[in-house]
Amino acid sequence: MNPEKELDVARSEFIKSFNYLVGTLRMNGLSRKVAVGLALMTLIGGRASIRNASITFKLNYANLLKTLENLENTWSDYLEALSKVIIGPVVVIIDDTFDHKLYSRVEGIASKYGNYFAWCSTHKRFEPGIQVLTIALYDLAMGKSYLIGAFPYSTRKMWESGMVSEFKTKIEMAAEIIEVLKERFHVARVVFDSWYWSEKLVKGSVVSELKSNRRLIRVRPLEGGKTLGVEGHPHVGDLPPGSYLAELTLGDQVITIKLLILVYKDNRLNLYTTDVNLSDEEIEATWKIRWEIEKFHKDIKALGMQDSSFLKRKRLQGYLLLFVMVVNTVRDLISSLNLKSVEELLRFVEYV
């Protein structure tokens, strides 16, 4: 194919992908001009901000801010559209990330409406930013992942120090969202890291990781061997690599899990599942699926998620939802154009 023909195909794919996104936005009653402006916001030069979009597309800035507040209601429409695309079993991936807000107008204190001064675990200090719960779906039949939600939340430390006036833990938020997803998708398994150990989440078919200091009541190797009930109870870290059936406490109850201990890239992994019938290979494969969400974190930050801050949480939630929809569209576009990354796509768009 000659270069001019390749460019024509690229333009066609670009228009098709973003027309789908614009159509989703318009389901909430937005005009086409506003929907196009929001859909293309992350691809215009400079910061991916609402003000930049209003200037570029000659849209009313105040009206765009109000539109963001209404975008929160678009989430159910977006899930409905995805449920028609994903018809097979899925794995729900739960994680979180820190969204730095370098341009936040809030300095040293939290916003009355949101938490714009949060603890950054990377830099070990409070910084302008937001803790964001992220949730993705992995289509087992097609081997494709979709980011389906990004939700700001407050930490317990912020609540106890009086920095925010509303509080819901990421575990409570994740549990609520999983129930919503089960109504629309065939959820085969849920995967998350060890920080989500809670009776609200560790139920059904879960694959996750245990900390090495977690105590076990009883443990039995699956390849022969007798049940161990060591006085004082063994820690997970005391066990050699292998597969085990183990009993341990979760809240006020005792549960049985399948424990798979691996050495992976010189690191020890203490994987477990509540579905004791899963094979070792299925457990490991499901755990590797969890890393799909880290790619989403990289992509939404490359698209400029951190470029704007808002005093009202509803506007922030709308802004995050916009990035959720855009990143899925961009990923489809990257694949169809045989590009390698969001950064490469952004360079490509300059010439299309």
Task: Mark where each language-model region is.
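Short secondary-structure transition/capping motifs
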Residues: 42, 67-71, 123-125, 163-170
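Short linear Ser/Thr-Pro motifs
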Residues: 49, 121, 273-274
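Electropositive nucleic-acid engagement tracts
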Residues: 25-33, 40-105, 226, 344, ...
